[in-house]
Amino acid sequence: MSATSTATSTSASQLHLNSTPVTHCLSDIVKKEDWSDFKFAPIRESTVSRAMTSRYFKDLDKFAVSDVIIVGAGSSGLSAAYVIAKNRPDLKVCIIESSVAPGGGSWLGGQLFSAMVMRKPAHLFLQELEIPYEDEGDYVVVKHAALFISTVLSKVLQLPNVKLFNATCVEDLVTRPPTEKGEVTVAGVVTNWTLVTQAHGTQCCMDPNVIELAGYKNDGTRDLSQKHGVILSTTGHDGPFGAFCAKRIVDIDQNQKLGGMKGLDMNHAEHDVVIHSGAYAGVDNMYFAGMEVAELDGLNRMGPTFGAMALSGVHAAEQILKHFAA
């Protein structure tokens, strides 16, 4: 240590954290003072392969017919999944996320900053999730946006009736003949690995897979003894798959029109996105939440304030719960 250094040598016995002596972080778990003979339990490489693939394909089989399909695992999609799956453990909730990492744009606040701002009353959802925040009067601040999205993601994935298929994208919607009212009827989603979808222009035909909504007989006709499943699209407004379902609905049904997202206005945008979230007129069994609603209905964007992202998911989830309760 140089003569000019201000560093102070401190023995381990002097270190304290909250008046509790610091000990080895694994001392109460592994309980090994001498690591020279440390060993993991043995395993074969094929055992790992079978453990992964058997469970994944079992999930594909189980969720091939789902009650709720959520497209997009950002803040609104995950918030909706939490509310639906927690309140209705009997429903199979399938979440499809195009990215390897779920969470959408909620890992950071605005302009890649850390803190997440939520206007009240969105703090009530934070309380439900037991996420700490600083109360600033009309709004609250979560110290890091990742704390919010990682918490809701963790809670959703622990629910037994939820499956997240990440690195998987929705390429199209499954449709049925229009209803008597002339409404387009969605009956499922067409999926593929995201990397395959992005490589369609480089290879010959690489056909997709399908996840169907509950409510149909083996011949494809409606089974009126079952509640029809629903799709909740929360694909945001930017990125390679932004507002995908909204754009696809407009392509399928010429009576529909894409409003196009307007400029930033926090006070109008957050309110409007929450209020407009939910069932979509003219499309049976289709719901929207999050920034995709702004693209669909021509609403303002709100920028780096996240209360509407969570509560639009909650609002859509409540409508979906009413659908299954009716």
Swiss-Prot record:
It comes from the Eukaryota. SUPFAM superfamilies: FAD/NAD(P)-binding domain. InterPro entries: FAD/NAD-bd_sf, Sti35, Thi4_fam. Substrate binds at S76, E97, S98, G105, V170, D207, H237, M291, R301, M302, G303. This is Thiamine thiazole synthase. Transmembrane segments: none annotated. One of its GO terms (biological process) is thiamine biosynthetic process. It is found in: Cytoplasm; Nucleus. During the catalytic reaction, a sulfide is transferred from Cys-205 to a reaction intermediate, generating a dehydroalanine residue. Pfam families: Thi4. Its main location: cytoplasm.
